[in-house]
């Protein structure tokens, strides 16, 4: 990294950046380096600064990066909306208070195709929104079901990589409901690539974000 400007300005910029690196380590939450639409999660282990070899009024910073999961990730998200009456009628909107605002009109719900352009199956996050009871989703023959009741403004998050299932109550309380997953087919089964058939009863909405992983990002 090369910093330009007056000496005091360069010092301030390096201090600010170092504070960000230190915060990631202290909170045990990796930061992200982006290349186009891909990112890799990492920590900055060490920093060295020196006078730039291009101009002596610039400062170079050399950083040592540690990637606990050394894969570049591109996220692909699709929302699956509930059918208001269960008969494919048009409905107006659902408004959730946690930045997942629905505002749409749509015909039948319950079966959708989703094309995932990748060379392998992918880990995912799945967010299931209430109100609903024992939500069940079929993806290419695999069953993803949680035996739990969700009220309005509650939702469940499934993380296939971390193997976690968390319920968020309307008041912001988080509950670990791992033990409420269905047995048999795994709710953590990776989602295959290609033309994917997704089926459910159409009575609730959910989002799926697949994590398309590569050892190096695609050249954009």
Describe every region a protein language model picked out.
Residues 1, 42, 61-63, 124, ...:
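Hydrophobic residues positioned within well-ordered beta-strands of beta-sheet architectures
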Residues 1-29, 40:
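Compositionally biased, low-complexity regions
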Residues 2-6, 66-70, 129:
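Solvent-exposed residues in well-ordered beta-strands and their adjoining turns
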Residues 7-9, 71-73, 134:
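Residue-level signal for secondary-structure boundary sites
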Residues 14-25, 77-89:
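Charged, amphipathic alpha-helical segments and their flanking helix caps
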Residues 17, 22, 36-38, 103-108:
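Repeat-unit-sized solenoid/scaffold elements
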Residues 26-74:
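Short beta-strand and beta-hairpin "edge-sheet" elements
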Residues 79-220:
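Intrinsically disordered, low-complexity segments enriched in serine, threonine, and glycine
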């Amino acid at each position: 990294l090369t910093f330009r400007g007056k000496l005091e300005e360069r010092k301030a910029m390096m201090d600010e950046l170092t504070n960000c690196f230190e915060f990631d380590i202290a909170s045990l939450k990796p930061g992200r380096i982006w290349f186009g639409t891909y990112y890799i999660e990492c920590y900055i282990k060490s920093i060295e600064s020196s006078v730039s070899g291009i101009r002596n009024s610039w400062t170079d910073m050399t950083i040592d990066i540690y990637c606990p999961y050394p894969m570049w990730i591109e996220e692909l998200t699709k929302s699956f909306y509930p059918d208001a009456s269960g008969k494919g009628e048009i409905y107006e909107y659902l408004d959730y208070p946690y930045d997942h605002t629905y505002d749409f009109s749509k015909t039948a719900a319950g079966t959708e195709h989703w094309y995932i352009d990748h060379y392998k199956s992918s880990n995912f996050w799945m967010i299931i929104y209430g109100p609903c009871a024992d939500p069940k989703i079929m993806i290419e023959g695999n069953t993803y079901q949680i035996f739990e009741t969700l009220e309005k403004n509650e939702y469940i998050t499934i993380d296939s990589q971390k193997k976690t299932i968390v319920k968020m109550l309307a008041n912001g309380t988080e509950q670990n409901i791992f033990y409420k997953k269905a047995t048999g087919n795994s709710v953590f089964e990776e989602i295959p690539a290609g033309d994917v058939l997704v089926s459910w009863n159409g009575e609730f909405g959910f989002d799926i974000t697949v994590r398309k992983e590569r050892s190096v990002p695609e050249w954009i």
